Amino acid sequence: MPTIKQLIRNTRQPIRKVTKSPALRSCPQRRGTCTRVYTITPKKPNSALRKVARVRLTSGFEITAYIPGIGHNLQEHSVVLVRGGRVKDLPGVRYHIVRGTLDAVGVKDRQQGRSKYGVKKPK
């Protein structure tokens, strides 16, 4: 327990909240423009070519976002919606692109888990 004199000398510091997605600035999603669309390889035990995009957000941040699902139509200057959520085997990728909104179309011929990939119910 500090004394009154110690508390006067230096006040108690508030606990700072550390966020896992700082570029979103406490928003659930952010809009951004793709500056580069490319593939990268995952960390050690895994092997693949994961599709990612470099995105300049409306908050001013330049981030790397993962493009989920099989096949995509994104290219440079595509306008996308970005949400938080990291990809465990891609270091530095802490955001996901939301499929089925703005310029990112939903995954073609998707039957299960459609809501996560922006696909309407098939007739």
UniProtKB/Swiss-Prot annotation:
CDD domains linked to this entry: Ribosomal_S12
Gene3D superfamilies (alphabetical): Nucleic acid-binding proteins (2.40.50.140)
One annotated Gene Ontology cellular component of this protein: plastid
Signal sequence, start to end: none
InterPro entries: NA-bd_OB-fold (IPR012340), Ribosomal_uS12 (IPR006032), Ribosomal_uS12_bac (IPR005679)
Function: With S4 and S5 plays an important role in translational accuracy. Located at the interface of the 30S and 50S subunits.
Known partners and oligomeric status: Part of the 30S ribosomal subunit.
The protein's name in its UniProt record: Small ribosomal subunit protein uS12c
Organism, as annotated: Cuscuta europaea
